[in-house]
Amino acid sequence: YLRHGLDGEYDILGVPYVDYECDVERGRHLILYGHNMGVGESERFSSLQNYKDPDYYTRHPVIRLDTLYGSALYKVVAVYALTARTADADYFPFNTYVDFADDEAEQAYLDEVARRAFYTTGDYVRPDERLLTLCFCTYEMEDARMLVMARPLREGERAEADEVHIQPDPQLPARWPEEG
């Protein structure tokens, strides 16, 4: 999937794929990985890099996910960055949270994401809602990942941006470059 298309032919952009531990049909947390090659706005996950900017979120608060099982709209709730190096002291194994033992475990995970987020959207995730996390490379440092977390658009809810809460001091990877 990393360097081949659905037809099996070589494709530098690969194909987005689901974490192997996720239950695609019934799981509580669906994690998708894709390339951000910076090639163009429409190239796989490249445009997701724009979510680092809260103004982009206000213009694009909803993500559409199309699968073999159907289509769904998800509302962005947080955007954060991680190191992919498991040896780094501040490594956060977000991909091990594909299901939650109980509501408290899920809340602990959401609190950890909020501590790391560039911003949160003033929205919240209900205990019965599925999470969607889109994970892709970002190039502020070597082996960095950006993550966009969303929850389903609720019945009757408008696809509009919620208020943005900029995190003044998010917990970024130690190797993350200083701004300005």
Question: Positions of the model-derived regions?
Answer:
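Solvent-exposed, non-transmembrane regions of membrane-associated and secreted proteins
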Residues: 1-180
